[in-house]
Amino acid sequence: MSEYKQCIVTRDDLKLSKGKFAVQVAHAALSAAEWASKGDLEKWKEGGQKKIVLKVPSIKELYELKEKARREGLPTALIQDAGLTEIPPGTVTVLGIGPAKEELIDKITKDLKLV
C-alpha cells in the first residue's frame, strides 16, 4: 500500500519571522489539500497527514517546482502574502504540493533540503 504525504516548499531567500513562516506553511498545507482528489485526501488523513517542509534558494526554483508538479498531475498551491506585516503585498512565499502518493512527490522533491 502506498504512503501519502504533503510537501511544503519554502523560499530560503526570504528571511521571515518564525510566526510569519509558520503561517505561510499553514496556508500552503490547507490550500494544496483543497486541490487533492477525495481519495488521496482520505488516504492521507488515515495515514496521519504526513507533511515535510523543504526549501529552495529562490522564487525561480519555486516556480520550476510548481511546473514539475503540475506536469505530474499533483495538487499544488502557490501562496502570495497579503503584505500587511513583514513583506510586500503579493510576495510569493511558499508552495504546497499534495497530499498525494509519496513516490510521486519524491520524484520531484528528492533533491531538496529539509528546512
UniProtKB/Swiss-Prot annotation:
Its EC number is 3.1.1.29. It comes from the Archaea. GO terms for cellular component: cytosol. SUPFAM superfamilies: Peptidyl-tRNA hydrolase II. CDD domains: PTH2. Belongs to the PTH2 family. Keywords: Cytoplasm, Hydrolase. It catalyses: an N-acyl-L-alpha-aminoacyl-tRNA + H2O = an N-acyl-L-amino acid + a tRNA + H(+). This is Peptidyl-tRNA hydrolase. Disulfide bonds: none annotated. It is an enzyme of class 3 (hydrolase). It is found in: Cytoplasm. Gene3D superfamilies: Bit1. One of its GO terms (biological process) is translation. InterPro entries: Pep_tRNA_hydro_II_dom_sf (IPR023476), Pept_tRNA_hydro_arch (IPR034759), PTH2 (IPR002833). It comes from Methanosarcina mazei (strain ATCC BAA-159 / DSM 3647 / Goe1 / Go1 / JCM 11833 / OCM 88). NCBIfam families: arch_pth2 (TIGR00283), PRK04322.1 (NF003314). One of its GO terms (molecular function) is peptidyl-tRNA hydrolase activity. The keyword Ribosomal protein does not apply. The natural substrate for this enzyme may be peptidyl-tRNAs which drop off the ribosome during protein synthesis. Its main location: cytoplasm.
